[in-house]
């Protein structure tokens, strides 16, 4: 069983842009953002809004939910990295997510 290669949101959008031979300035213009902001997204310095991720997905004709998931998992991973969290903390967070799901479903 092979594992899927992990990538960041920024790496993914950079790859998609290069596969379509699009310069950053054209992608940025299409998304109505500054080129420097797109570069920050590609370098994982900043995270775009959900609305912008949907626009990016439409531009590159990819599944928006997959891109949103990738951006969200990046955000979680960076937060855990910053907090120097261990696996015990991750298990507690998983349990809390399950608890919150049950609370929200009544």
Map each language-model feature to its residues:
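Short alpha-helical DNA-recognition segment
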Residues: 21-40
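Residue-level detection of the helix-turn-helix DNA-binding "recognition helix"
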Residues: 18, 32, 43-45, 72
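Short, charged recognition helix plus adjacent turn
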Residues: 66-106
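Helix-turn-helix DNA-binding elements, focusing on the entry/boundary residues of the two helices
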Residues: 13, 24, 35, 50-53
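DNA major-groove recognition helix of helix-turn-helix/homeodomain DNA-binding modules
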Residues: 32, 49-66
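Alpha-helical residues within the helix-turn-helix
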Residues: 18, 29, 58
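A short, Lys/Arg-rich alpha-helix, primarily the initiator
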Residues: 1-19
């Amino acid at each position: 069983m092979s594992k899927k290669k992990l990538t960041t949101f920024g790496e993914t959008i950079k790859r998609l842009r290069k596969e379509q031979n699009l310069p950053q300035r054209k992608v940025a213009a299409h998304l109505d953002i500054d080129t420097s902001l797109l570069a920050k997204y590609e370098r994982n310095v900043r995270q775009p809004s959900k609305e912008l991720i949907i626009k990016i997905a439409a531009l590159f004709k990819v599944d928006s939910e997959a891109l949103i998931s990738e951006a969200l998992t990046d955000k979680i991973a960076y937060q855990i990295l910053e907090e120097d969290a261990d696996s015990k903390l991750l298990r507690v967070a998983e349990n809390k997510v399950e608890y919150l799901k049950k609370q929200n479903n009544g």
